[in-house]
């Protein structure tokens, strides 16, 4: 029987929208935009799943999952399933995080395609701990068939290597936000709205850049024109001044 370990006191350590099974189970399940976690837990059995729940944002949502997983060394597998989240592309971002990690300077998930794929509230060490602790991340993105998901969970359980060699790693998120919705000016908005806002911002930046370039070119051309006129006048002065002086003598 695989060796087990004690999770962090009070595990799960971060509140969220999830169901908890057996803390000694080796699998955590991320249902992305679908709320099928209870069906999965019931079908698979609580002894096979440690924690399951949706994750709808590619930043704070992923951070919460990481925080709860690394606080329990018994979790060695992850299953990504359920509907992909439009705009956020949380599943793709989660997979990119596992495969590539994050930029150490900016916290950006390397290779992520979501709207705001930055893990800014957890240290890089937490991300690397997750990547090392999880021996396999099963990609069932856009799969909502409970039987297929349970089959993947059972295959993970059969390969359970036992608890991670290091003890629980606990972190506190620097910023708590609602996972389901982002907020703009205090008002909750959907993933699609967030994406549109960022696209509009990109357009604004582009327009400002074009305007700045136009002003620069106008000034540059105006300067060249003025310089050309000064050059012509100076040339005429130097050309005709000796003639005037000599003619006067």
From Swiss-Prot:
Record topological domains on the Extracellular side: 247-249
Subcellular location, record wording: Cell membrane
Physiological role: Part of a complex that catalyzes the formation of methyl-coenzyme M and tetrahydromethanopterin from coenzyme M and methyl-tetrahydromethanopterin. This is an energy-conserving, sodium-ion translocating step.
Family as reported in the entry's similarity comment: Belongs to the MtrA family.
Keyword Methyltransferase among record annotations: yes
Protein name: Tetrahydromethanopterin S-methyltransferase subunit A
InterPro entries: MeTrfase_MtrA/MtxA (IPR030688), MtrA (IPR005778)
Disulphide linkage map: none
Functional pathway: One-carbon metabolism; methanogenesis from CO(2); methyl-coenzyme M from 5,10-methylene-5,6,7,8-tetrahydromethanopterin: step 2/2
Predominant location: membrane
The keyword Transferase appears for this protein: yes
Listed GO biological process terms: methanogenesis, from carbon dioxide; methylation; one-carbon metabolic process
Transmembrane segments: 226-246
Keywords: Cell membrane, Cobalt, Membrane, Methanogenesis, Methyltransferase, One-carbon metabolism, Transferase, Translocase, Transmembrane, Transmembrane helix
Pfam families from the UniProt entry: MtrA (PF04208)
Catalytically driven reaction(s): 5-methyl-5,6,7,8-tetrahydromethanopterin + coenzyme M + 2 Na(+)(in) = 5,6,7,8-tetrahydromethanopterin + methyl-coenzyme M + 2 Na(+)(out)
GO CC annotations on file: plasma membrane
EC number: 7.2.1.4
Obligatory cofactor(s): 5-hydroxybenzimidazolylcob(I)amide
């Amino acid at each position: 029987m695989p060796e087990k370990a004690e999770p962090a006191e009070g595990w799960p350590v971060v509140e969220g929208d999830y169901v908890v099974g057996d803390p000694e189970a080796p699998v955590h399940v991320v249902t992305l935009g679908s709320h099928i976690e209870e069906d999965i837990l019931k079908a698979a059995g609580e002894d096979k799943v440690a924690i399951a729940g949706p994750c709808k944002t590619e930043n704070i949502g992923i951070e919460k999952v990481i925080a709860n997983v690394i606080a329990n060394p018994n979790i060695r597998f992850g299953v990504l399933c359920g509907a992909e989240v439009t705009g956020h592309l949380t599943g793709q971002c989660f997979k990119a995080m596992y495969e590539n990690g994050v930029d150490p300077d900016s916290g950006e998930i390397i290779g992520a395609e979501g709207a705001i794929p930055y893990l800014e509230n957890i240290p890089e060490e937490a991300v690397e701990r997750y990547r090392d602790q999880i021996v396999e991340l099963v990609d069932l993105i856009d799969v909502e068939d409970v039987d297929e998901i349970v089959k993947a969970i059972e295959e993970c359980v059969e390969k359970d290597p036992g608890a991670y060699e290091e003890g629980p790693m606990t972190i506190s998120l620097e910023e708590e936000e609602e996972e389901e919705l982002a907020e703009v000016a205090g008002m909750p908005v959907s993933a699609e709205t967030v994406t549109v806002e960022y696209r509009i911002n990109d357009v604004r930046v582009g327009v400002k850049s074009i305007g700045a370039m136009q002003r620069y070119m106008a000034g540059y051309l105006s300067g060249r024109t003025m310089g050309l006129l000064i050059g012509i006048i100076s040339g005429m002065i130097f050309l005709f001044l000796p003639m005037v002086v000599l003619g006067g003598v």
